[in-house]
Amino acid sequence: LSINQSLKAQRQFASDVSGGRSSQSIYTAFEQVLAQLDLKGDLLDFGAGTGNLTKRLQTLNRFSSITGIDIMQCPVDIDNSIRWITWDLNDKIHLPNQSFDVIVSAEVIEHLENPRAVAREWFQLLRPGGTLIFSTPNNESWRSLIALLLRGHFVAFSDTCYPAHITALLRKDIQRILSEANFSPPKFVFTNVGGIPNFPKLQWQTFSGGLLKGIRYSDNLLVIAHKPMS
């Protein structure tokens, strides 16, 4: 195999390993943010995977058009009104600049090789005043920090998560990456669903009656940023 063929095969394998889906709590968090911000217009689901979030967003009847893009083929149950593009998201996307009012990306950036290139791509694809919402593992939770201390890696970046998860980001990394791409300072929202170290099926929220939440007690975070009007 050539280097390009080998890389393509590696990326496809990583995509297959990931399964192309996220948790219901993450999808719900996206829906809540979209409703709170009253976002409308043309939406891009960047890294749409098996289309679970794409289909849920369509049922909201908020958007004039929805486009899904992923290395995976178009799911058979995707509505014909949704445009689907099969594309390796590590590569430059051949879409016109300023095509979308909203970009969502659920648990995708940690799968990609160059988050800075991705942020620049998002910025170019958004219209002025457009909104970016993406999620990624929260590497600053107690569960993840303890894993780093005891095992030498964040909890979502163990050998069992590889080669799907390859890019671990902290809030400071995200702030810098988005700033370099000229986005507004990001806001962070936490899913408030988080496993207890060594007992991941037990959640802090259940144990504490919902009192424990936020950065130390959430497995995932959402990032909200805007493209300035000028």
Placement of each model-derived feature along the sequence:
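A SAM-dependent methyltransferase catalytic signature shared across enzymes that methylate proteins
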Residues: 172-189
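Short catalytic micro-motifs in class I SAM-dependent methyltransferases
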Residues: 106-111
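A short glycine-rich, Lys/Arg-flanked "PGG" loop and its adjoining helix->strand segment in the class I
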Residues: 116-128
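Short, flexible, mixed-charge acidic loops at enzyme active sites
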Residues: 145-153, 198-202
